[in-house]
Design a protein with these regions (language model features):
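S-adenosyl-L-methionine
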Residues: 64-98
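Active-site segment flanking the S-adenosylmethionine/decSAM binding pocket
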Residues: 84-126
Length: 248
């Protein structure tokens, strides 16, 4: 191992790196940031095998130099798609918001210190961590590779609060509760607050259902865009249409 700022560097086995990047479904359209890059292995694989633009952040200057030499030896040094570069920097002083994929092999306390920054990223950003969790933010997938664990999350949109839902030229109050990617809530129909069913939030995509006073179930799917949502709905009698919602 090699000492970084807050972590002792231990290389991640190749098959774990592969699985991490596969879990994140990395493509040449992605910008992968590896936080705590060590020898650059994850950033190099993201560029070479997955065709992504990759940037590793490494605090130890010697290690960063070594990682860039590894990228050059692998034929992927540089910027742009299919290229990897390792920057000597502090991960907590680094702007990560442009990344579409974040990879981590840090200590639990560092994951937790980064967590607010990660949750503030663009909904749909993919995050993979080797060995360590994000505590009560449950992973969307856990893979095991020769006894080592890799955890995957997708940054959820922020939907908690009260919304005005418009569908079929009718307005209703939609109240949403949220704990990370888990959501629940109700729709106000006159004096009745009908509970939501089959709720799901995956990145910017939301779905929920409820049974109206007419005893008909309606299924809503849509996309969250800040203080707005829009999508389509269907009811079990074959009716369908568009819906929008605005945050109050």
């Amino acid at each position: 191992g090699q000492a970084g700022k807050d972590v002792i560097w231990v290389p991640t086995p190749d098959e774990v790196v592969d699985r991490m990047l596969t879990m994140a479904q990395v493509t040449p359209q992605d910008f992968v940031m590896d936080l705590g890059a060590g020898d650059g292995k994850i950033a190099i694989a993201a560029a070479k095998k997955f065709g992504a633009r990759a940037v590793g952040i490494e605090y130890n200057p010697e290690m960063a130099k070594h990682a860039n030499a590894n990228a050059a030896a692998a034929g992927v040094a540089g910027n742009g798609a299919g290229k990897a570069t390792i920057r000597q920097a502090d991960i907590f002083q680094t702007d990560i918001k442009e990344a579409t994929v974040i990879t981590l092999y840090l200590l639990p306390a560092l994951n937790m210190k980064l967590r607010p920054q990660i949750l503030a990223m663009r909904p749909g950003t993919r995050v993979v961590s080797h060995s360590f969790t994000m505590e009560d933010w449950e992973a969307d997938e856990i893979s095991s590779i020769d006894g080592r664990r890799a955890y995957f999350w997708m940054v959820p949109a922020q939907v908690m609060g009260n919304w005005t839902l418009e569908a079929n030229n009718q307005r209703t109050d939609l109240a949403l509760e949220q704990t990370f990617q888990k959501i629940n809530g109700s729709v106000g129909i006159g004096p009745v607050h009908a509970g939501l069913r089959d709720t799901r939030l995956r990145g910017p995509f939301i779905q929920f259902s409820y049974v109206g006073q007419d005893r008909v179930r309606r299924d809503f799917t849509g996309r969250v865009d800040g203080a707005k949502m829009e999508g389509s709905f269907r009811d079990e009698k074959g009716g369908e249409g568009k819906w929008t919602a605005a945050k109050k």
